[in-house]
Amino acid sequence: MSLFNNHPELDFTMREMLIDWLINIYFDQNVEISNRSLVSGIMMIDRYIYLEKTSISRKMYQGIGVICLNLACKLDDTKILGLDYCEYICAGIYTADILSNLEKRILKVFKFGLHFKNILHYIKLISIKENVDDTVYVFARLMLITILFKTNYLTIKTKSMAKNLMNFSKWFVNNKNVEIKNPIHIYFFTELRRYITHPHFTSINRLAKEFRIFSLIKSRIPNIIYLEKPNVFSKEIIPIELQNSLTIEYTENQLNNMNVIEKLGIGSFGLVNKVKFDNTEIALKTHHPDDSKEIIVESLREINNMIMLDHPNIIKMHGYYYSQGITHIGLELCDMPLYKKLDKGNLSPELKKSFIIQLLCGLKYLHNNNIIHRDLTSSNVLIKGDTLKICDFGCSRFVYDKKIIGNYSLDVCSVRYRAIEILNGILPYNEKIDIWSCACLIAEILGEKFLFRGRNEIEVLDSINRLLGKTVGSGRVGFSMLEKHYPNETQIIYKMLDFDPSNRPNAKLVLKIFSECFVAQSELLVNNQKTTIDKNQIS
C-alpha cells in the first residue's frame, strides 16, 4: 500500500518539499523545537496520512504538516509553536479557524492516541547501552532525518531501522574502509549524498553544519565506493495501529444532552460539573482557555495519558470532546477530594493504612506505565467510598523510557509538595519527584497537615532545610509529632524525602516497605491482644 493511496492530490515530491520546509522551521530563532519533536512531527504526518480515509487536498498538506509539528511540541517540549505562529509561518494560506479544524480532525483520527516510540527513541537507547561516541550519535540523528525524506522507513520495524542506522553511523564515522557492501548501508549513503548537496532541499546541509559534522561528511563522501543495489525495502507499509482505549469520544449531541446537576469545582483550568449522561452521573471537566482556538497542552496530555490507564486507584476517564480550544472530559464521579476527607477527621488506623497502600498502588501503576504525575496533592486525590483514586493528569508527563532524559518544565507540582531538586532548579528530574510528593501526602493521611509550610518556593525551601537539614541528616529537627505517633512510618517518609533522588526508593519498593510495616504492626497487635487474653485467663 502506498502512503497516498487515499489521497490522489498528494505525491512524494510534495512530501519532500514539506519535510524540507519543516526542518527549516527548526532553525527559526523565534521557536524552540527539540530534535525529538521534529522527528515525531514528521512521523506523525505520515501516520495521519496513512490513517485518514477521507481524501486530503493538495492545499491542506502544508497545514497538516505544521499542525502535526505543533502537536509533537505540545507532547514533548516545554514550549510550543502555537496557532498564531503556525498561521504566520504558512504566510496566511490558512486562517486560525482552518488550522484549528485541522488540529481537531487530526486528533479525531488518532483518537487522541499520539504517543508512539519513534526511531530516535531507539537510537538514543542504543547509544546509551553501547556508550557510543558523541560524533556517531550526532551523525545517526542526522541520518535519521535524512531518511525521513522518503517513506521507505515505514516498511521496516522502527527498532530494526534504528539498529541499521546506528550500524551505518558507526561504520561511516569510524571505519577507514572506503567500500560499502551492505545493501541497506548503500541506500543510507546514497540518500545522504543526495540531500547533503541537493540544490533545492537545503535543510540537511544546514543540519550537518548545525551538528558540526559537515566537514566530516564532506571529507568522507568522495572516497566511498559501492555498487548500485536494487531497493532493499518492501513496497508494503507496516500497518499502523492506534492505541487501545476503552474511552469514547462524545458527539456534540451527547454533550448537549448532558444535564448539569451541580457545580463541583472551579479553578484556573476551568470548571467541573456533576452531570447525568446515559442514566449515569459523571463529573464533566471543562477546559475553556481564553482567546485560544487550539487545544492546550494540559488537556492534550491529560487525555493522551489517561486513555492508557486502567486501575482501581486511578480515576477513570469515560469520554472526551474537543472543539475550537474547548475540551470536555467525562470522569468517574467520586465523593470528595482527600483533603476534605482528612478535614473531617476520625479516620480509623485501618483506613489510614488502606489509603496509603492504595495511593502507592496507584503511583506504582503510573510509573510502571512510564507516566510521571508531577502534581500529587491532597486536592488531586479523590475518595469514593473507601477507595482512593489519583486524578488530575494535566501536569502529567509520559516518559518513553526512564533512561532517556526529556525536556522538562520546572513549573510543576504545588509548591508545598514540590521536590527539593525542582525547588533548586535542577534539571533533569525523573519519577522520583512523585515519591517526594507522595511522602508529603502520606504524612497528611497520618495527621500532619503540611510537612513543609510556606507561601512560595523560598519559604518552602527554608522549611525543608529547617526540618531536614541543609544536607541529609545534618542538624535535622525532623517531624517530632509524626515520630511520636508513627515512628516506623516516619522513618520510611524520611527515606522518601532524601535530597538525592537516586537514593529515594521507587514506588514499588515504598509499597513493599509500607506493606511489610503494616503487616508487622497487625501481627504485633494480635500478639499483644493474645497476651492480654492469656493474662486475664490466668488471673
From Swiss-Prot:
Record Pfam families: Cyclin_N, Pkinase
Reaction equation(s) it catalyzes: L-seryl-[protein] + ATP = O-phospho-L-seryl-[protein] + ADP + H(+); L-threonyl-[protein] + ATP = O-phospho-L-threonyl-[protein] + ADP + H(+)
Catalytic residue list: 375
Keywords assigned by UniProt, alphabetized: ATP-binding, Kinase, Nucleotide-binding, Serine/threonine-protein kinase, Transferase
Binding site for ATP: 264-272, 285
Residue ranges of domain Protein kinase in the record: 258-519
GO MF entry, a single one: protein serine/threonine kinase activity
EC number: 2.7.11.1
The name this protein goes by in its record: Putative serine/threonine-protein kinase L670
Family: Belongs to the protein kinase superfamily. Ser/Thr protein kinase family.
Organism: Acanthamoeba polyphaga mimivirus (APMV)
Domain Cyclin N-terminal: 1-115
Enzyme class: transferase
Keyword Transcription (UniProt): no
Bilayer-spanning residue ranges: none
Family annotation (InterPro entries): Cyclin-like_sf, Cyclin_N, Kinase-like_dom_sf, MAP_kinase, Prot_kinase_dom, Protein_kinase_ATP_BS, Tyr_kinase_AS
PROSITE patterns registered for this protein in UniProt: PROTEIN_KINASE_ATP (PS00107), PROTEIN_KINASE_DOM (PS50011), PROTEIN_KINASE_TYR (PS00109)
